[in-house]
């Protein structure tokens, strides 16, 4: 059976995500802090145009995040970040979600590009 390059790439991504989901490592653990800020977590492929567009939007609203949330990036190109994709069940990019300081998921946006207003609403009041 001969696979096209596109099919092979999809297969490799699926295998990597499955391996990450089966891994006992959960990635870096946040330090225990009282009163720590929630995290706005951005799962991205730095080479993908939709993810690049979402990154620009996040940079636009970054000044509004100060004191409200910590912005955390997980990239498909960083091997150390891959387990986080499995941990949160990420299957589509770009994806934004909000976690508490310990990493527990609070809210998740629909995968795709979120406008500045959608990012603000995701963070809540």
Where do the language-model regions lie?
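Non-catalytic, surface beta->alpha helical segment in thiol-disulfide oxidoreductase systems
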Residues: 98-125
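Thiol-based oxidoreductase modules, predominantly thioredoxin-like and allied folds used
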Residues: 43, 67-81
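Bacterial N-terminal signal peptides that target proteins for export
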Residues: 2-12
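Typically the conserved alpha-helix immediately C-terminal to a functionally engaged Cys/Sec
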Residues: 52-64
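C-terminal motif of bacterial Sec signal peptides marking the signal peptidase cleavage site
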Residues: 18-21
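Short active-site neighborhood of thiol/selenol oxidoreductases, capturing the structured segment around
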Residues: 34-47
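Bacterial signal peptide processing site
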Residues: 23-26
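Structural micro-motif
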Residues: 88-98
């Amino acid at each position: 059976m001969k696979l096209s390059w596109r099919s092979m790439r999809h297969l490799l991504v699926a295998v990597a995500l499955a391996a990450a989901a089966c891994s006992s490592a959960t990635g870096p653990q946040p330090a225990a802090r009282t009163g720590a800020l929630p995290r706005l977590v951005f799962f991205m492929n730095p080479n993908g145009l939709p993810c690049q567009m979402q990154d620009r939007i996040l940079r636009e609203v970054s000044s509004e995040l100060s004191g409200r949330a910590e912005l955390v990036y997980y990239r498909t190109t960083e091997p150390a970040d891959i387990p986080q994709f499995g941990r949160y069940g990420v299957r589509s990019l770009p994806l934004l979600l909000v976690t508490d300081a310990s990493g527990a998921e609070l809210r998740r946006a629909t995968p795709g590009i979120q406008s500045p207003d959608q990012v603000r609403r995701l963070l809540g009041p």
